[in-house]
Amino acid sequence: MDTIKTEKRVFPTNMLRVCVDQFTEDVKGRVYSKLSGTPIMFENCCELLLKTDAMFDRCGYPQTFQEKHDFNGKKVSNCYTSPEIFLADEELETKCGQLTTLDVFVSSRRNTSWQGIIKQVNKDAVIEFRSDIELLSGIKHLLMKGI
């Protein structure tokens, strides 16, 4: 695995570094975030969304704009504190995928979905997304274009 060489960067807390290791019919890889001390492994797009969304919920950041309920109909409270940082910028910038590396900036989580941009590391490709479906479509578009 090659190391990505970049200038010293400061990564926002709401950024996910998606390291894509395999791409056939679906995407497989790892997600690194300042909000998690361990990589989030995913076998497909569904796991990518579910596991990272669960991490955001635990941290309360980016804040959700809807109330969540458990299966008993009870409201699940959202925490709105400053998130704990587990991964330093210097360490985050060294992470890269075997096929490609994407930085996903989640600006908000509205209407039970995500909004933000996808940036392919070391390339000019940037895609804006307004929903989970657009996020996954953008990731697959970048992978099909660049591989």
Question: How does the language model describe each region?
Answer:
Residues 1-18, 22-24, 52-112, 142-147:
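Intrinsic disorder/low-complexity detector
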Residues 14, 27, 41-45, 100-102, ...:
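Broad hydrophobic/π-residue packing in well-ordered secondary structure
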Residues 20-36, 107-123:
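Short aromatic-glycine-(Arg/Gly/Cys) micro-motifs in beta-strand/loop hairpins
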Residues 35-43, 49-57, 117-147:
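Mixed-charge, glycine-accented linear interaction segment located at domain edges/termini
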